[in-house]
Every structure is written in structure tokens, then in C-alpha cells.
Amino acid sequence: MALSTSRAINHIMKPLSAAVCATRRLSSDSTATITVETSLPFTSHNIDPPSRSVETSPKELMTFFKDMTEMRRMEIAADSLYKAKLIRGFCHLYDGQEAVAVGMEAAITKKDCIITAYRDHCIFLGRGGTLVEAFAELMGRRDGCSRGKGGSMHFYKKESGFYGGHGIVGAQVPLGIGLAFAQKYKKEDYVTFAMYGDGAANQGQLFEALNMAALWDLPAILVCENNHYGMGTAEWRAAKSPAYYKRGDYVPGLRVDGMDVFAVKQACTFAKQHALKNGPIILEMDTYRYHGHSMSDPGSTYRTRDEISGVRQERDPVERIRSLILAHNIATEAELKDIEKENRKVVDEAIAKAKESPMPDPSELFTNVYVKGFGVEAYGADRKELRATLP
């Protein structure tokens, strides 16, 4: 498997700029330029790859660390809430994949659109959603981002260009192509990131949507988050050709180390520039989820604990940023631990506030069901009692 080969490589990013290797604390100048090299080269299909050299700053490094550790703490807390039966139904966690959400967000604006599948909590947070909105939604409360009606799989923040959160495998991709069509129709200089997993990569509708995007040169970026397992099925057992970045054939693609936030940032910056001028491109993010597929999956029956711990030790996205911050004397280990401690506190406070939010009124069952204006009648289970006329 390709993942085991990549594990043998030392993936820690290498600092290139001698000027910033001085022992002085760079935090005194948060805008100082630091040049880093991506952990691995980009592998490309029908396109010249971007440079491996990426510019950053102490401020951005610290922001990445804070954002990724906050996302991870949120997902760990969600795990505990689910086990305490405060979250019901489906719940898919994102810990391990944080570099994709954070790196992508660093390359785009809130006018660009993102649409994804059901592993959506961290994408929502990256788009500007709050922890209170996230936890309230997970617990089915009125103050949730979908008013407590969507749950884990249906987070939205339309005003920031986040269109969900979708529970049907692969069905979000055609919707994403529709968003890109609207952007081109309105002559906007923005793009849409349509995200899906390796488990959805064989869905027929994905190829149909990609063909349409290519035919009309739509500003669409298809992001395959390849965490190597579709539920419990390894990629090589489900796909004859698991090189998902080549799947478009006539559409260019890049394979990206999705555990390296700077590789993701560089690839997304490159992809946006390409899509605005030339149409769609595929980004395959080589990433890894630490939890099982969902809360009912222990995640250890189809992969070994050694495999999981090996990825944690050698490729963890948070530890990469921590190493880079320490190498450039931007912060001390104690200061980074203080940030993590503060994140823990912020998450705990958000959970407490979300618990105070009331449950939705039962009348909410009859809202947002049909397009307004049809006056559809809704009956009870016995079909005798008229419960409501839907607006």
C-alpha cells in the first residue's frame, strides 16, 4: 500500500531560509517571512506541479497550530459526548485530517465555496462557524448551525460559502459543480471546492459532474480526501486504480501530502489560479483519520494499532507545525502547551453553553420540508389527524 511506503520517509518540513534560523525569537516580528519546503514533492497529472517552497510567517504558524489543536480538541470532545449519549445518530470525526481543512482555508476567501460530505465539523469551524453552534447542532439544540435539525452530517454556513455537510455518498459533488456553474454564470472570480472521500471516488455521478465541469470550463476544484479506507474497505480493495488525481483523464490533477498544511495551502492556491483560468482540477489529499469511520466503528478491525500509531508518530499534522515553531524559536514548548490548555477550556465552555440551548420546538418538524407556497398538508402516523399545513 502506498501509505506504508510514505511512512518510511521523514516528513518533517525542512526550513530553507537561513535568515530565520537565528536563535532570536521570531515572535517579536509576526510578519517575518519564513520559507519552508513541503514534506513531499507534488505528483502531477497533465500539469506542471507547483513549487515545493512555501512562504509563511510566525503569525501564520501560530494560527495554524491554534486552529488545528482546537479542531482536534473539538473532535475528541464530540467523541466523549457521543459515548455519554448526548449526541445521537451518525457522527463522523475528522481528527488526523485537520491539515486539509486549515491549509485549504489559508488559500482561499469566504467568497469561494466549499461543499463536502458528512465528515464536516472542522470544515464548518474553518469557515468561521463557532464551537457553540457546532456542539449545539451535534446535540440537536436550537442554537445549532442548522437549528438542531441537521445533526452531525448537516452543518451549513451559507453566508461564509459553506454549503454542507451531506449524508449521501458522493451526492455533494454535482451540487458543487452547480455552485461553480453559478460562479461562472455570474462572472465571479471565485471557485468551488467539492470535497469527497476515496470511498466516494467510484460513484458514477462524480464522473458525470466532472465531465460537465470540464466541458464548460467551470471553476471547480474536486478534492478527494484519501484517508485510505472507505468505511472499513482499503482503497486497493475498492479501486483498480487508486491514483484518484488521475481519474479525470482529461482533467489535470495533483497528489498532495494532506498531512502537511503547507502542501495543502500551496496546492489549493495553485488550483484556484488554474481553475479560474482553465477550468476544473483534481486534488488528491493523502491523509489519514485516527478514529474509525463513524462512532460504531472501532477502527481497529481492518487496520492494525501499529499502523495508526505509526502515522501519529511520523505524519501527524499538528506535530509538524509544533516542530517548525520550535525550530524557528517562535514559541516554547510550554507556550504551545498553554495554547492547547486554553483550547481545552474554550471547548469545555462551548459545550456548557450549548447544553443550555433549548431543544427545537416540535413545530420545527414541519418547516424547511418543501419549497414555500405549496400548502402541503402533514398528517400524523395514523393519517387521521392533520398536524400542520406546511408553508
From Swiss-Prot:
Swiss-Prot/TrEMBL cofactor(s): thiamine diphosphate; Mg(2+)
Functional description taken from the UniProt entry: The pyruvate dehydrogenase complex catalyzes the overall conversion of pyruvate to acetyl-CoA and CO(2). It contains multiple copies of three enzymatic components: pyruvate dehydrogenase (E1), dihydrolipoamide acetyltransferase (E2) and lipoamide dehydrogenase (E3).
GO MF term (any one): metal ion binding
One GO biological process term: pyruvate decarboxylation to acetyl-CoA
PANTHER family noted in UniProt: PYRUVATE DEHYDROGENASE E1 COMPONENT SUBUNIT ALPHA, MITOCHONDRIAL (PTHR11516:SF65), PYRUVATE DEHYDROGENASE E1 COMPONENT, ALPHA SUBUNIT BACTERIAL AND ORGANELLAR (PTHR11516)
Enzyme class, UniProt record, top EC level: oxidoreductase
NCBIfam families assigned: PDH_E1_alph_y
Residues binding Mg(2+): D198, N227, Y229
Organism: Solanum tuberosum
Keywords assigned by UniProt, alphabetized: Magnesium, Metal-binding, Mitochondrion, Oxidoreductase, Phosphoprotein, Pyruvate, Thiamine pyrophosphate, Transit peptide
The protein, known as: Pyruvate dehydrogenase E1 component subunit alpha, mitochondrial
Renumbered residue ranges of the record's region Disordered: 294-313
Enzyme Commission no: 1.2.4.1
InterPro entries: DH_E1, PDH_E1_Alpha_Subunit, Pyrv_DH_E1_asu_subgrp-y, THDP-binding
Subcellular location: Mitochondrion matrix
Highest taxon of source: Eukaryota
GO cellular component: mitochondrial matrix
Composition bias, Basic and acidic residues: 303-313
Known regulation of activity: E1 activity is regulated by phosphorylation (inactivation) and dephosphorylation (activation) of the alpha subunit.
Catalytic activity: N(6)-[(R)-lipoyl]-L-lysyl-[protein] + pyruvate + H(+) = N(6)-[(R)-S(8)-acetyldihydrolipoyl]-L-lysyl-[protein] + CO2
Pfam hit, one: E1_dh
